[in-house]
Amino acid sequence: MKKNLFVTKRDGRKEKINLDKIHKVLNWASEGLDDVSVSQVELCSRIQFYNNITTINIHETIIKAAADLISQDTPDYQYMAARLAIFHLRKKAYGQFEPPKLYDHVKKMVDLEKYDENLLKNYSYKEFLQMNSFIDHWRDMNFSYAAVKQLEGKYLIQNRVNGKIYESAQFLYILISACLFSQYPKNVRMNYIHRFYNAISTFKISLPTPIMSGVRTPTRQFSSCVLIECGDSLNSINATTSSIVKYVSQRAGIGVNAGQIRALGSPIRNGEAFHTGCIPFYKHFQSAVKSCSQGGVRGGAATIFYPIWHLEVESLLVLKNNRGIEENRVRHIDYAIQINKLMYQRMLSGDQITLFSPSDVPDLYKAFFSDQKKFKKIYLQYEKNKNIRKKTIKALDLFSLMMQERTSTGRIYVQNVDHCNLHSAFNPELSPIRQSNLCLEITLPTKSLNDVHDTDGEIALCTLSAFNLGKIKSLDDFKELSILSVRALDEILDYQNYPVLAAKKSAISRRSLGIGVINFAYYLAKNKVRYSDGSAHNLTHKTFEAMQYYLLEASCELAKEKGACSLFNHTNYYLGKLPIDTYKKYIDDICNEPLHLDWNLLRSKIKKYGLRNSTLSALMPSETSSQISNATNGIEPPRGFISIKVSKDGILRQVVPEYKKLRLQYELLWDIPNNTGYLQLAGIMQKFIDQSISVNTHYDPARFLNNKIPMKQLLYDLLLSYKLGLKTLYYQNTRDGSEDDQNITSKSITEDICESGSCIL
């Protein structure tokens, strides 16, 4: 590099380039890291220097040089690049490396209207000094490079027009804690703030995008999962559409139950007109979902639910594929098919499935969710009733069409409605589960609206977080983490605003939470067990037993302190039923691990005090949160040791945790021979989880004759999922070779559907 080059400082001054300054920063960034070379980063950087380059560009150049060196053999470059990026970020935010004192920072941000003014009203100067003492800014150096770029892109308060950053990560963590516990008694709240800050800033607990980016700002809307049920009237359809727009404008993910909409050709007003069927209204929903685009961000995302016995099912199943024309396709939303035991039995016995318009059989539609015995009885009666419009189709043909479309699009999902109601947190007679959410992990009661202000309707919301299994040293750790998660998320329900009254009614009366996990693949590798061979069964059983037990215990303690949720009597917990009472007993055939905790003691406590929250657990996808925590995604096996994601900031490489130590213990997705082991582990988890799991299936055509996945295999996995008691199936991933080059996932499928980040972590 020529030493007579000049640089332009951040304040506009020019001076000769000082190589020692750069060298000093690089030495600092590499301290304590393995297999990183300062000279190698300098070598890569020098080529790109030019006269009058700005110090900002120099910094960005050396960051990119370090990031480009991230590989399986040299994973610590992800931390070197991250430290350089943190240095740069703080310079942009504060004009210096050292962050300001917390009170000074909050005062300035409130004056700029970036932070909620209630922070200064709720806490004294002395309390800010105390919170400042809790902060460990060096924890910023624990982020990977991909995590820093996610923080910059999604979480940190900024001006999205000019790119100005206003804060760094530790202020985010301490102020989320301060906001959520602001209404706790003054004699205990600082203790909770300190504990919660430590848990989230050390990645033991992961929070979703709406909370991470929104709590501490004047905007108090943190919609996670939104479930909206649509009735069979124009008023209800329009109310559904209006509700979709309100929540999509907040970048929320939407689940829509459109199963009641009558079929094509059904009479309207006693035959005065005939119905146009489902497809025009699905298009209406699609337009609503895609209507809001903020600053060039793509519109929202939704999954539509309908029963497999709907009269239009053959036309609905193909709505997402690339064949057909625009008039008979609705490709920009996803679909979930609702199935129960009788439908599976018809397929296995080689029988027919009879299709109806739900409007002709309203009692059948109701029983489909609330009473399986009654459903079968009514279904058989309607099949014999010659006065009701119907159509029969061979069950195997219908299931094959469904699985064919699931394979070709990857995004035809499955909801087993009987499992959702028989192994549920809710009493199906009072609060049946009639749909799920965008990502198929939430199972909460809903009720259709007649207008957007309808106080009788119910829109379900669920508030999410996750435990990082990689940080669990003992199963007893779940006790403290459950106390903190349950209390913090419960506070959000009262802290946030609600754009639709029916959503507030549901959230406040049911207080449903969905707490899941990240880093399961690392957890298995660390414990030297695998997805595919059954060796992880007992560990998984013990882990998820402890998780659900301590979540319920924490909610029960909170109910003792603050009272049970007002609709606690709508839950199975109210009846004394726990998840261990209602799970699919086939699980006992594949896992003989006994229960280790005192469930009868817990049952008696719940009977005495109730629960503060109707539900506690759900296992969601966790793309973004996993990157922040440098963890593997949810319960999923990694596709490769290093993931490469192409973003607006360039290529982001992230290496699985402890790659060098555990590379022989990790089981990569495409090395797993089939879905059986993964599905069995999900079934063991579902034994304890009181909502559902975003369960994916994966197929490598190269493993099959003529590179074609046999329908027999697809149906086998579908039936196995049902046999294991799984409530829902999410993506079907088919290996096409495009990701084999260093496992590139240029825009992961989860990130693509869940752009809002609301229904995922």
UniProtKB/Swiss-Prot annotation:
The record marks C225, C462 as: Important for hydrogen atom transfer. DTTP binds at D232, S233, L234, R262, R269. Under complex allosteric control mediated by deoxynucleoside triphosphates and ATP binding to separate specificity and activation sites on the alpha subunit. The type of nucleotide bound at the specificity site determines substrate preference. It seems probable that ATP makes the enzyme reduce CDP and UDP, dGTP favors ADP reduction and dTTP favors GDP reduction. Stimulated by ATP and inhibited by dATP binding to the activity site. The active site is at N437 (proton acceptor), C439 (cysteine radical intermediate), E441 (proton acceptor). The record marks Y730, Y731 as: Important for electron transfer. ATP binds at K9, E15, K16, I17, N18, L19, D20, K21, T55, K91. One of its GO terms (molecular function) is ATP binding. Residues 5-95 form the ATP-cone domain. The record marks C754, C759 as: Interacts with thioredoxin/glutaredoxin. It catalyses: a 2'-deoxyribonucleoside 5'-diphosphate + [thioredoxin]-disulfide + H2O = a ribonucleoside 5'-diphosphate + [thioredoxin]-dithiol. Keywords: Allosteric enzyme, ATP-binding, Deoxyribonucleotide synthesis, Disulfide bond, Nucleotide-binding, Oxidoreductase. Disulfide bonds join C225-C462. It is an enzyme of class 1 (oxidoreductase). Provides the precursors necessary for DNA synthesis. Catalyzes the biosynthesis of deoxyribonucleotides from the corresponding ribonucleotides. Belongs to the ribonucleoside diphosphate reductase large chain family. Tetramer of two alpha and two beta subunits. This is Ribonucleoside-diphosphate reductase subunit alpha. It comes from Buchnera aphidicola subsp. Acyrthosiphon pisum (strain APS) (Acyrthosiphon pisum symbiotic bacterium). The gene is nrdA.
